[in-house]
A protein has these predicted regions:
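Internal helix-turn-beta structural module
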Residues: 297, 301-322, 331-398
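Glycine-rich beta-strand-to-loop/alpha-helix junction loops that act as flexible
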Residues: 11-12, 89-92, 207, 321, ...
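Extreme N-terminal starter segment of soluble prokaryotic enzymes
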Residues: 2-7
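Short beta-strand-loop/turn "lid" adjacent to the catalytic site in phosphate-handling enzymes
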Residues: 74-121, 140-142, 148-157
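Short glycine-rich, Thr/Ser-proximal phosphate-binding strand/loop in the N-terminal lobe
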Residues: 15-60, 227
Length: 398
């Protein structure tokens, strides 16, 4: 085990997720999740050696309070002195950053500049970053951008068909997300299949509460479904994905809704939750659909159909298909969704292997198509934290 450990932080507006990793082995020594930040009942849950315990944060219910509680927990286990650097997930680096970078004042200013591109996420990342700088004094901080991997997209893939001055003036274009996951999974897929990633044309579906899909060729992103923000593309847990932009004027005129209300509705009340009227959790949707609930059945079919359609279009972007890859919480665990998606893809020569599909769950990688399929469909568990740890160690010189 290497002497120095990496702390990885992923901050949301009301949450903070953390993990302490051994960069060499990938082992997670301690993890935490702070929830309800900025509310009086804020708390943080720690997991160490398989045991969990909860700490009240009501005295300081913000990101600094959460990072402070994390420092105390590390001290209690004698791990505080072994932290060598801190890695941070940042949703948007816009066009400023095409790779991970060591933090200085200029980088913080750059992340601030990208706030309009990720107004829900980047401010929270900055709170976590500043908290880490104040509590873990003197340690190097590294930021890893969700958008960086997609900076290889060609101009015709990232440009929107609107007046070009809007791009030049405001940076209005497709940026994508989940890039750290795609970078990890494209490497792992090649390793798992025993191929060079530069020889593989991949379509990778990262399916969780937020869901996106990316075409990868020559080891690089060629196109992706998320756009200016993570709202575009697939049907998601609470996000609508693709929708006619005229919805804004239609709802403003007919439902008397403001832009802020419509944006909030499309981000937080739509997707599986909005269609089903039940839940944003795919497991609940699958269970209720099996019982015949009409809303759940429709939500599931829409999720699957939209995904299958996008696989077809991303195959064009990749220049063909050698490997279709499922990852993320839903992609790694829902054999039902994978089977039904592949049911649409017989025209691509992809045929499900039922037994293999059932085995490839709960952290198990595996090929889930038959030997006579023209390409492979494969399940590869993602590990964004490990990718962030690797970048952090490398850029910190550990």
């Amino acid at each position: 085990m290497s002497q120095k450990l990496i702390l990885v932080l992923n901050c949301g507006s009301s949450s903070l997720k953390g993990a302490v990793l051994d960069n060499d082995s990938g082992e997670v020594l301690l993890s935490c999740l702070a929830e309800k930040l900025n509310l009086p009942d804020a708390y943080i849950t720690f997991k160490f050696n398989g045991e969990k315990h909860k700490v009240d944060l009501s005295a300081k219910p913000d990101h600094t309070g959460a990072v402070g509680a994390l420092m105390e927990e590390l001290k209690a286990h004698g791990l505080d002195s072994r932290i060598g650097a801190i890695g941070h997930r940042v949703v948007s680096g816009g066009e400023l950053y095409s790779e991970s970078i060591l933090v200085d004042d200029e980088v913080i200013a750059g992340i601030e500049k990208c706030i309009p591109l990720a107004p829900l996420h980047n401010p929270a990342h900055l709170l976590g970053l500043r908290a880490a700088q104040s509590i873990f004094k003197g340690l190097p901080n590294v930021v890893v951008f969700d958008t960086a991997f997609h900076q290889t997209m060609p101009e015709h893939a990232y440009t929107y068909a609107v007046p070009h001055e809007l791009y030049e003036k405001y940076g209005l274009r497709r940026y994508g997300a989940h890039g750290t996951s795609y970078r990890y999974v494209s490497d792992e897929t090649a390793r798992f299949l025993g191929k060079d990633k530069k020889d593989l044309r991949m379509v990778i579906a990262h399916l969780g509460n937020g869901a996106s899909i990316t075409a990868v060729a020559n080891g690089e992103s060629r196109d992706t479904s998320m756009g200016l923000t993570p709202l575009e593309g697939l049907v998601m847990g609470t996000r609508s994905g693709d929708i006619d932009p005229s919805v804004f004027s239609f709802l403003a005129e007919n439902a008397n809704m403001t832009i802020a209300q419509i944006t909030d509705m499309l981000n937080k009340k739509s997707g599986l939750l909005g269609i089903s009227g039940l839940s944003n959790d795919c497991r609940t949707i699958e269970e209720e659909a099996a019982k015949g609930h009409p809303g759940a059945k429709l939500a599931l079919e829409m999720f699957i159909y939209r995904l299958a359609k996008y696989i077809g279009s991303m195959t064009v972007a990749a220049g063909g298909l050698d490997a279709l890859v499922f990852t993320g919480g839903i992609g790694e665990n829902s054999d039902i969704i994978r089977e039904r998606v592949l049911g649409y893809l017989g025209f691509l020569g992809l045929y499900i292997d039922q037994e293999a599909n059932l085995k490839a769950r709960f952290g198990n990688a595996g090929v889930i198509t038959t030997a006579d399929s023209k390409a492979v469909a494969v399940v590869i568990p993602t590990n964004e934290e490990l990718m962030i740890a690797h970048d952090t160690a490398r850029l910190s010189g550990l």
